[in-house]
């Protein structure tokens, strides 16, 4: 297993920039900026909470401090062992968000949550986040529902997300964890920049 201690903080920051885990991309239908987060791209084995906080402080928060914005979080394909930073790290990152940025956040669109994510947030959501933020969370099971709120052609959506969305249309029970993901979803993981970097680190 790779550990974050094997790469410096500057390398961690460069990795976050390269993978575009967190990026301001497009606007919603009210003209507000959209902060897009791709959960599957977050290399939790390589990047510490401190490095993530520094990246957000330098690259993201200054762009969100003055006007309202929304978040689109793509949970598609997230693996707990590879992409989940841990409860304490999530809380630490949330606590580091400046008050004016929290106030400007209007909605969090949680795309492809799945049963486990819903249960996790139902159990720990109010512990991790303030009631105000938790109340802004909106589950989005299909991309078509996202486009009711977000300008479709302004927010870049990775191909593996659209592929998974098509699978859900054909096999809706996947939403509830009753069916496993389509094999092509697993194949796509090997093509992601996270996997490439991780395999390089392991070797």
Feature annotation, model-predicted:
Residues 1-203:
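Basic, amphipathic alpha-helical/coil surface patches used to engage anionic, phosphate-bearing ligands
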């Amino acid at each position: 297993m790779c550990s974050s201690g094997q790469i410096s903080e500057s390398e961690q920051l460069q990795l976050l920039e390269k993978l575009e885990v967190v990026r301001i991309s497009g606007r919603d239908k009210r003209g507000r900026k959209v902060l897009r987060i791709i959960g599957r791209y977050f290399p939790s084995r390589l990047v510490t909470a401190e490095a993530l906080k520094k990246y957000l402080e330098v690259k993201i928060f200054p762009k969100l401090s003055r006007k309202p914005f929304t978040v689109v979080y793509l949970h598609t394909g997230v693996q707990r062992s590879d992409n989940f930073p841990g409860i304490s790290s999530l809380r630490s990152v949330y606590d580091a968000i400046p008050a004016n940025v929290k106030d400007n956040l209007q909605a969090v669109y949680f795309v492809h949550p799945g049963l486990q994510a819903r249960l996790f947030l139902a159990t720990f959501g109010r512990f991790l986040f303030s009631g105000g933020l938790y109340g802004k969370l909106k589950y989005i099971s299909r991309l078509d529902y996202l486009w009711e709120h977000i300008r479709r052609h302004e927010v870049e959506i990775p191909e593996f997300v659209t592929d998974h969305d098509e699978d859900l249309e054909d096999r809706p029970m996947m939403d509830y964890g009753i069916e496993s993901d389509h094999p092509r979803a697993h194949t796509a993981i090997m093509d992601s920049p996270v996997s490439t970097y991780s395999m390089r680190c392991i070797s």
